[in-house]
């Protein structure tokens, strides 16, 4: 099993919306990927509940699981993922990620 974890810091304002509105939209988009991309086995999306404006905090986190590395690769090449990435790239300041094999 492959776990894909991504954290984003969002711009204060982008695409005509506030950070919070874009975080909510991003959550809906990411959760919707599971419906359209069969390789995703599990997906969780969280919005940081800490309102502290600390530079150390991140706004949105994605945790998604894939059965194999090939499934993860197929996910990254899927048109729904590419469409989501267009929105993501328009609203983020920074991104950090880690992909790892889970022992199950």
Residue ranges and their predicted role:
Residues 1-58, 67-74, 101-104:
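Short S/T/G/P-rich N-terminal loop/turn motif that feeds into the first structured element of a domain
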Residues 69-90, 94:
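C-terminal structural segments of small proteins and small subunits
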